[in-house]
Amino acid sequence: MRWVSMRVIKVGGSVLENLEKVFKPEIFRDAVVVHGGSRYVDELAKKLGLNVEKLTSPSGVTFRRTTRKVLDVYIAAVMKANRELVSFLRRQGIEAIGVSGVKEVIIGRRKKLIKAVINGKIMAIRDDYSGIIKEVNVEMIRNYMKVGVPVIAPIAYDPVENVPLNVDGDKVAYHVALALKSRELYFLSDTAFLINGEVIDKIPRNRIEEYFPYSSGGMRKKLLMAKKAIESGVERVIIEGLNGRTVIS
């Protein structure tokens, strides 16, 4: 398997409004960008008076319950984030191209049920529109790369149910990195990996699991994706925040 010298960058929703503070033009050239948008979703839901329930998985990861109404808000919000990120990159001289999962770049399958811990019990929820990523349309992404830097929204398309899906941006970035055989997966977040308030500069590839107990929420998810990416052939994973960077290799 030949891995290519390009990177996949995940721009977290938490840094979209502060991107100029962490923006480095050299890392965005010859790259594919994936982004989040949680803040945008929360803001739009609040504006519309829609209550968005936050749940916790049995593994301790917090996620948004995506009903059909929440899905509509989610798509509108992350596409707004997509437009703003593309606009920012173009102002910096990067020929960015907005890409939506609705255009079948990310193929997914709607989860038949999701599990959440509610009142101390593991419950099954079936009315959810979140998805599992099944396939990345490599040919379509490479065609976009011929003319610029693709900026991919975290939306998948389920061809069986003919519906768009809420998919996690970190997982999209991981799957895109593997599909494109990228050497580097780069997370731009609000913070690097911390222990007791101190940035951990390096994590050896064979010791990632040792750091799991010191992580939670979105950072736990990033470490999980980093472990899977390294095990699958990605050479290094970087978590860069406003306070420094953590290199996993």
Swiss-Prot record:
Keywords: Amino-acid biosynthesis, Arginine biosynthesis, ATP-binding, Cytoplasm, Kinase, Lysine biosynthesis, Nucleotide-binding, Transferase. It is an enzyme of class 2 (transferase). InterPro entries: AceGlu_kinase-like_sf (IPR036393), AcgluKinase_fam (IPR004662), Asp/Glu/Uridylate_kinase (IPR001048), LysZ (IPR037529). It catalyses: [amino-group carrier protein]-C-terminal-N-(1,4-dicarboxybutan-1-yl)-L-glutamine + ATP = [amino-group carrier protein]-C-terminal-N-(1-carboxy-5-phosphooxy-5-oxopentan-1-yl)-L-glutamine + ADP; [amino-group carrier protein]-C-terminal-gamma-(L-glutamyl)-L-glutamate + ATP = [amino-group carrier protein]-C-terminal-gamma-(5-phospho-L-glutamyl)-L-glutamate + ADP. Its EC number is 2.7.2.17, 2.7.2.19. It comes from the Archaea. SUPFAM superfamilies: Carbamate kinase-like. One of its GO terms (biological process) is L-arginine biosynthetic process. Pathway: Amino-acid biosynthesis; L-lysine biosynthesis via AAA pathway; L-lysine from L-alpha-aminoadipate (Thermus route): step 2/5; Amino-acid biosynthesis; L-arginine biosynthesis. Substrate binds at residues 64, 166. The record marks 10, 222 as: Transition state stabilizer. PANTHER family: N-ACETYLGLUTAMATE SYNTHASE, N-ACETYLGLUTAMATE SYNTHASE, MITOCHONDRIAL. Belongs to the acetylglutamate kinase family. LysZ subfamily. Involved in both the arginine and lysine biosynthetic pathways. Phosphorylates the LysW-bound precursors glutamate (for arginine biosynthesis), respectively alpha-aminoadipate (for lysine biosynthesis). This is Putative [LysW]-aminoadipate/[LysW]-glutamate kinase. The gene is lysZ.
